[in-house]
A protein has these predicted regions:
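Phosphate-group recognition and catalysis centered on beta-loop-alpha active-site segments
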Residues: 7-335
Length: 335
């Protein structure tokens, strides 16, 4: 589907009479939202900077095809754990997602909870005291009270940001092309999350995280068209998930956080399924810390060279700066 961005009518590159060899029809992008800016469309040199996008790139692949494209082009998707918190940018806030998107991150793992009165929001902990100015349990608090809280960053600094509704984040993802990995918390259900995704029309911007075959089956039952991550290290695991109703074309194979399993990744790829792995975890123990201990992070390139497609990390900014594979994914496959 071609995105309309303030040029009427909007020609294709081949239809644009002003386009000549070495030129493309482009629009500038808002650095915060990733959306084309109105009244910036025009014919320019094909070496236009990275803050513009051609019409052909505006066509977003359906999410399963997008993952296939990244795998086939040996690209990498970097998933920012809890949305990519940074100084002044707390975890699980829309402003943090926008900040990380402007830094080139395109996949965001975020946590979905539900308030006492049934509003879904981004929040990791059961209690409010660590990441907000509030106290008590999320499940015991109405949305009107949650909405007034301020978010606190990892340095315990209060910000002007508030807990975001899931619906608002879904709409932002749909507009920007971002991909959300939704981690369901016990206060809500896959059924409720899937319903919100459908209502927002954001199915091509969402993966649901499962932690067991039962959860994978529950996701498939809630909406068989949604993509998900589920534990799989080859054909046997994939077949077992298929027997539970999981569509392999909607599957990303999660392979853990303890150590890279190159053989498992090769088996998943042989089945046409993208492997995922995490270097995140407890500070001092996670692979992120081990890989950066010598300052160069070369181990991340080893992951790419062995076929990894989706990397969940607590260091998305450093990894994105060190690798070219995420740039390759955007260049070849869009978003």
């Amino acid at each position: 589907m071609l995105l309309t961005v303030g040029c009427s009518p909007e020609p294709t590159e081949s239809e644009n009479p002003e386009a000549t060899q070495g030129q493309v029809y482009t629009c500038d992008l808002d650095p915060d939202t990733g959306k084309p800016l109105p009244d910036t469309c025009g014919t320019r040199s094909s070496d236009t900077g990275s803050n513009s996008i051609s019409l052909s790139e505006l066509k977003k692949l359906p999410l399963p095809a997008y993952f296939d494209c990244v795998r086939e082009n040996k690209g990498l998707l970097i998933a920012a754990h809890r949305g990519g918190p940074a100084p002044g940018y707390p975890e699980n806030t829309l402003e943090t997602l926008q900040h990380a998107f402007a830094e080139g991150i395109r996949v965001f793992e975020v946590d979905i909870a539900e308030s006492r009165d049934g509003v879904m929001l981004l929040m990791h902990d059961n209690r409010l005291n660590r990441t907000t100015t509030g106290d008590g349990y999320v499940a015991d608090t109405d949305w009107a009270d949650l909405a007034g809280l301020r978010m606190v960053d990892d340095d315990n600094q209060r910000t002007d940001f508030h807990p975001p509704k899931l619906t608002d984040v879904l709409l932002w993802a749909k507009q920007s092309g971002a991909i959300l990995e939704l981690d369901r918390k016990p206060t809500t259900s896959f059924k409720n999350i899937a319903s919100a995704v459908r209502a927002a029309g954001a199915g091509d911007n969402v993966l649901l995280i499962s932690y067991s075959d039962d959860e994978a089956a529950e996701i498939a039952a809630a909406d068989a068209g949604l993509m998900m991550t589920a534990g799989a290290k080859g054909s046997r695991d994939i077949g077992r998930l298929e027997a539970r109703g999981v569509d392999r074309t909607r599957l990303v194979a999660w392979t853990g956080t303890s150590s890279p399993d190159y053989a498992a990744w090769a088996r998943d790829i042989q089945e046409g399924v993208e492997p995922a792995f995490g270097t995140l975890g407890r500070k001092g123990e996670r692979l992120d810390d081990q890989y950066w201990a010598d300052g160069d992070g070369s181990e991340y390139q080893d992951l790419v060279d062995n076929g990894l497609v989706l990397l969940a990390t607590d260091e998305p900014y450093r990894v994105a700066a060190a690798l070219k594979s995420d740039d390759l994914a955007r260049e070849k496959c869009g978003r």
